[in-house]
Amino acid sequence: MASRREVRCRCGRRMWVQPDARTVQCSTCHTVTQLYSLVDIARGANRIIHGFQQLLRQHQPQHHEQQQQQMMAQPPPRLLEPLPSPFGKKRAVLCGVNYKGKSYSLKGCISDAKSMRSLLVQQMGFPIDSILMLTEDEASPQRIPTKRNIRKAMRWLVEGNRARDSLVFHFSGHGSQQNDYNGDEIDGQDEALCPLDHETEGKIIDDEINRILVRPLVHGAKLHAVIDACNSGTVLDLPFICRMERNGSYEWEDHRSVRAYKGTDGGAAFCFSACDDDESSGYTPVFTGKNTGAMTYSFIKAVKTAGPAPTYGHLLNLMCSAIREAQSRLAFNGDYTSSDASAEPLLTSSEEFDVYATKFVL
């Protein structure tokens, strides 16, 4: 036999009744209490829900069904395009940010990225499908140069890197400086790249760029960065800076920090920057007749004219010569578009090396 169940009267008295009892009278206050089983409660709840659903259907706007039909007739949203496989021997990330519609917009950055792609494919043997382009002209949301997408692309570039991998990172856009808060900068300033949404999402500072792009490089892997932006000298936070004189002599400056390791995991990293950390880069129509980054143009021209396997020193001298030639021509007609026409390309590296003995190979 099923055990009795407990009920409580409104006066507080506890009573024990049979499971199938429908009423019970309190022996203290003589109040009669109606009893309900769990089945009765469930049935009542179902009736309430059913009635509420009918009420909603009666008062639903007539055009709602039409809206539902239209939504069902529309094709499903396009899935985000996946990134290409990161496991090719040659791969690149090219970012060009014009900041369209902003008061600080630029004119030649997207063209710079496209010119770099042509160089890598036509001259350096990079497969077209191993090059990730991030510009405002791209159709895929994943290819817009936002902070999130640039970070994701940088991680893709070095993911699973191996010996003999050749990796290229190019950025053409705005660069800037901000206060260094971890004490790893000699000048007290962090360098940063400005993605399209930097006003809301923030900049990408050199500490993070080094952590993502430089630190994971394994023995035998090689990264070349080409940065066409202001304040970009040490934007990869590489520890050695090559100071090249006009007569071709050079010396390495050691910027290693005791607070943080800025090298690789055995690989090699090189960066060609448009200018020093405290300088501005230039855009000029003198090279091609339309606005283009002076740094990007001089790099491409030097690679094309240097001959097979030039040294880093030869390449850097050719780049500086191209910039100086442009400066002379622009000084004559006064249409240089940068605030610092004296800026020249700068080479930084994860290690010191003989720039006139080491071959530049992508």
Swiss-Prot record:
GO terms for molecular function: cysteine-type endopeptidase activity. Its EC number is 3.4.22.-. It holds the Pfam family Peptidase_C14. The active site is at residues 174, 230. Keywords: Hydrolase, Protease, Thiol protease. GO terms for biological process: proteolysis. The keyword Hydrolase applies. Belongs to the peptidase C14B family. This is Metacaspase-3. The gene is AMC3.
